[in-house]
């Protein structure tokens, strides 16, 4: 498959570079693990915050309350209209005027706010794709609107929501490369530090590209497996 060719090709390239040209490729690889851990931490924390924020936003856009609907819609329009890089700078310096916020925390907040808006649209579309008769049937059985949403609608919508949510996770992982501008020592910043000391820019960024490719391919495979599992249980 295309995934297997891409993943094993990248993995074989990484191994060959480290075995046949350990200086500098193996040295670069040894220098990067701390940055890889930070990249994972930023990604996971941002996912954990953006998912509930996206759900709240999606429900807000579907709310019958005009004020809540307006607030949720405005949040989505404003955030989607600004580049992530601008949001990172704005959150970092705006919070810095009032609070002493660590670089990594500011990066996570900015990533969560940005992707919360995109997730909100995904949740809204997923919920709207479910037949409205489901809501009416549940309400006729005595469920409240909130119970119906969480016990009936969302479990069905999750199958539809998962693929685009997975794509957002992958995009978020790649966008963590931008947090290096806030002095967060992610994998890209660690690579830049090594390149600045050794002047091996081509070799360093080759390794960074391979590492990002391997991580994103693993994440996409995980999402694909979850999707197949959900479809299997739904069909049986």
State where each predicted segment sits.
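Transmembrane alpha-helices and adjacent helix-loop boundaries
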Residues: 1-236
